[in-house]
């Protein structure tokens, strides 16, 4: 009997620390970090800059692509607002990864890890405004391998200095 209780105690001592310190699986879209940057952040009139919105997803979480293969999935979509007079070029979404998940019968097109959405902002030569804020509104649906979470919209702000 003492030998049996020692074995049980040893198993508990070995398993308990791993359970206490293990990172929990992603539970919602709030686990997706969204950030943005403009490079360079200073621009002369008559020039363009590249802006990037980055979605950083932890392991175990993915986001639907901008063109999901199932009509019931919500596409990732970025809307961009700039100061009056600046122009936004076409938005370039990353190439999705094709995955077969537990809840899907067919492959789904998703973004995993780090996904970068890019677009150009042009300041015309006759631009009369000053520096300004570029605002992105990113709508996406995050999922894990078992289920999808309700869609969310995140706002990203980037500053552009016009010289």
PLM segments and residue spans:
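Bacterial N-terminal signal peptides that target proteins for export
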Residues: 1-10
């Amino acid at each position: 009997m003492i030998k049996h209780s020692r074995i049980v105690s040893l198993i508990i001592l070995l398993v308990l620390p791993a359970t206490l310190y293990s990172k929990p699986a992603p539970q919602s879209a709030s686990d997706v970090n969204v950030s943005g940057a403009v490079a360079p952040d200073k621009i002369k009139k008559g020039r363009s800059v590249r802006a990037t919105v980055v979605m950083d997803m932890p392991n175990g979480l993915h986001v639907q692509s901008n063109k999901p293969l199932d009509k019931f999935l919500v596409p990732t979509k970025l809307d961009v607002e700039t100061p009056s007079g600046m122009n936004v070029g076409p938005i370039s979404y990353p190439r999705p990864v094709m995955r077969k998940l537990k809840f899907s019968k067919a492959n789904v097109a998703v973004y995993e890890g780090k996904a970068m959405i890019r677009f150009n902002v042009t300041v015309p030569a006759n631009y009369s405004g000053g520096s300004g804020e570029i605002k992105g509104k990113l709508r996406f649906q995050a999922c894990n391998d078992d289920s999808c979470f309700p869609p969310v919209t995140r706002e990203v702000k980037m500053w552009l200095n016009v010289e």
